[in-house]
A protein has these predicted regions:
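Sparse recognition of residues in long alpha-helices and their boundaries
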Residues: 39, 75, 105-106
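Short, intrinsically disordered/low-complexity patches at protein termini
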Residues: 33-34, 73-74, 79-81, 111-112, ...
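Catalytic strand-loop segment that frames the active site of acyl-thioester-processing enzymes
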Residues: 1-50, 137
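HotDog/MaoC-like acyl-thioester-processing domains
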Residues: 1-8, 85-139
Length: 139
């Protein structure tokens, strides 16, 4: 077994304004709240916010880096709920909990069900997540 029920893993991340803008451009997200500090200052958010594609990538990336250190890993499905913005220059905690591990003979590994979130500097959940990955010896 390469994953364990109740296993937790996390990391802290701070996205700079230039990282927020570059990721949004690369993802094809033209919303100026991710690119233009002057525009963002006039919104309800008052500053640059990371795109949903960027925050979801942080969550998916953490599963990949965590489980790939133990063997082969493939993402099967992910679900996200965006509750509040993640701001540029805000240090956030990206967290996952292994909820269930199911051996899957046909796929040749364990199907791992996860529950995750990104917590803002205030401790509140900014993004909620669920995921399912395959962890195996080989692909």
């Amino acid at each position: 077994m390469k994953a364990y029920p109740r296993e937790r893993f996390s990391t802290e991340v701070t996205l700079t304004p230039s990282e927020v803008a570059a990721f949004a451009r690369a993802a094809g997200d033209p919303n100026p709240v991710h690119h233009d500090p002057a525009f963002a200052a006039g919104t309800r958010f008052r500053r640059l916010t990371a795109s949903g594609s960027q925050t979801s990538a942080l969550l998916m990336g953490l599963t990949a880096s965590h489980f790939s250190a133990r063997g082969a890993m493939v993402g099967l499905e992910f679900w996200f709920r965006f509750r509040r913005p993640v701001f540029a220059d805000e240090t956030v905690r990206v967290e996952w909990l292994v909820v269930k591990v199911t051996p899957h003979a046909r796929l040749g590994g364990d199907v791992v069900d996860l529950r995750g979130r990104i917590r803002g500097a205030d401790g509140q959940t900014a993004v909620g997540a669920k995921g399912r990955v395959l962890v195996a010896d080989t692909l």
